Amino acid sequence: MSSPPASTDHRLVGSTTGAPDTPSAAATPLPQTLWSLQVPLHITHASKSTAPFIVSVPRFSYLALLLPRLTAYYGLPCSSFHHEEIQLRNLAVGLLVDLYQPATLPWRLVVGDGPEWDIADTFTNSAKEADFVRNGNAKQIMSLSKEHSTALWNAVQDNDHVSFGKVNRRLLNTPSPFKNVPIRIYIPSSPNDTGDATPGSFKVVQNLVSPRLPNRAPQTLGAALKSMLPTLFPSSRDPVLANVILHGGPVPFRAPLEELMREAAYPDGWLCLCVVLL
């Protein structure tokens, strides 16, 4: 069973990732490119030796959206996913790929019976939190009509970039400048961190980061990283001890943070970066 992908390259398309610099690629807006990227999956059931379920899903989608199809396919309860015996959290597929860096594609996962996920509530709450971080309140998202609120989540389910953009512009085009940029940095844990770190675990660093420096110049990614994690990022200009991955590829430290958020945030509004040690 399969769904043909629009593109199975799970990396961020751009000059920083070594993607081809073709006229058509250069003319495609980055958000549209990101919405078109897909991740191929090879899913087996923990309690049944049926043929694997093969499918490609958008980077911006969620594994939980596959559960009805998987339950019907295997005829057994399906509610949780594992990668190498690590239970996966309810995060966007692309972010999970960046976190766990599967050695090969399709990504081999095991589905089974476990904790159930309410993905719609998870997405909505995360989007509200991002709105609060941006503006100091959640008035923008709370003022959306029920129709627009529903359309936002439906667009994620349907991987509909055009419909999503119509609603998302209402959230990003505010009368006042943003107070902060919603940013989360995911740092893989190791036994050396605590002595007993769970395999596959990670910690999330989330600070209030202004899109502008005190001199009103744009805040860059490098400056934000140095401010949030100075031990890992002693330089604001270049990666020295660690780098960050966004949508499968590195990002220039000189990138303006607000512009990066507007162009490459996940649909819930968060700029999610994964640390990779050098």
UniProtKB/Swiss-Prot annotation:
Keywords: Autophagy, Isopeptide bond, Membrane, Protein transport, Transport, Ubl conjugation. GO terms for cellular component: Atg12-Atg5-Atg16 complex; autophagosome; mitochondria-associated endoplasmic reticulum membrane contact site; phagophore; phagophore assembly site membrane. It is found in: Preautophagosomal structure membrane. GO terms for molecular function: Atg8-family ligase activity. Residues 1-25 are annotated as: Disordered. It comes from Chaetomium globosum (strain ATCC 6205 / CBS 148.51 / DSM 1962 / NBRC 6347 / NRRL 1970) (Soil fungus). This is Autophagy protein 5. Conjugated with ATG12. GO terms for biological process: autophagy of mitochondrion; cellular response to nitrogen starvation; piecemeal microautophagy of the nucleus; protein transport. There is a cross-link at K128 (Glycyl lysine isopeptide (Lys-Gly) (interchain with G-Cter in ATG12)).
